[in-house]
């Protein structure tokens, strides 16, 4: 895997500017919880992506119970699919708030009527396990004019290769591999590589425009005007 990740660094670091900025007042703050689990906030809207999930499912990342205890009231919950390393009905059920996933993506349009600065666009993407297809969506969040892509578990590159002017693209390693194999550039300022195994070995030198999300609790900030 280390050779694969090193090649990815060389391929995706060409001609891209860093995005990690923390000096501005107006920021979208992003916290990496584990797997594809993220918490995002601008101080008004609180969004959880692929969280809560079953801690340690399929030998992926565990997390402390305090992550559940700290979930904000009336947050928005967004899920790419229902596999246990991304979603837990049992853990999600007690929380109020708006909950979106493959079962009701058409309702995401209602968010546009509530805030001109926050929209989520769903894209049906392929996800197969042992040849069996599962209902799966990737998303583009447009927030204060900033565009954030969320791959989830898909390796399907048809959506990402058509997207323009992304500020941050969260991707799993197998999507990276498919993009490299097909020599497809991605129009984004920053990559966040997530859904790594806890024991994943990473290159020692990493370009500033690529973040390997292995350290749980890692913070990313995107400034906006």
Which residues make up each language-model segment?
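Active-site HxH/HxHxD metal-binding segment of metal-dependent hydrolases
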Residues: 63-119, 129
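Metallo-beta-lactamase
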Residues: 33, 97-145, 213-222
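Active-site neighborhood of phospho(di)ester-bond hydrolases with catalytic His/Asp-centered motifs
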Residues: 48-52, 73-89, 100-103, 149-153, ...
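Binuclear metal-ion centers of metallo-dependent hydrolases, dominated by the metallo-beta-lactamase
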Residues: 106-115, 133, 182-225
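Pre-active-site segment of Zn-dependent metallo-hydrolases
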Residues: 39-78, 89, 155-162
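Zn-dependent metallo-beta-lactamase
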Residues: 2-45, 202-209, 214-225
């Amino acid at each position: 895997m280390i050779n694969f990740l090193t090649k990815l660094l060389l391929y995706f670091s060409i001609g891209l500017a860093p995005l990690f900025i923390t000096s501005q007042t107006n920021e979208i703050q992003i916290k990496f919880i584990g797997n594809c689990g993220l918490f995002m906030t601008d101080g008004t809207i609180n969004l959880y992506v692929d969280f809560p999930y079953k801690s340690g499912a399929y030998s992926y990342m565990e997390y402390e119970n305090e992550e559940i205890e700290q979930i904000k009231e009336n947050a928005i919950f967004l899920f790419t699919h229902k596999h246990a390393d991304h979603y837990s009905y049992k853990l999600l059920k007690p929380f109020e708030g708006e909950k979106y996933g493959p079962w009701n993506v058409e309702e995401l349009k209602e968010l546009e009527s509530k805030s001109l600065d926050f929209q989520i666009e769903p894209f049906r993407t392929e996800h197969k396990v042992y040849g069996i297809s599962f209902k799966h969506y990737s998303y583009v969040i447009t927030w204060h004019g900033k565009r954030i892509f969320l791959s989830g578990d898909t390796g399907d590159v048809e959506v990402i290769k058509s997207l323009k002017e992304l500020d941050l693209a969260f991707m799993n390693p197998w999507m990276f591999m498919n993009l490299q194999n097909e020599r497809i550039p991605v129009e984004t300022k920053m990559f966040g590589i997530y859904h790594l195994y806890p024991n994943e070995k990473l290159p020692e030198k990493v370009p500033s425009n690529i973040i390997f999300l292995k350290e749980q609790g890692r913070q990313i900030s995107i400034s906006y005007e």
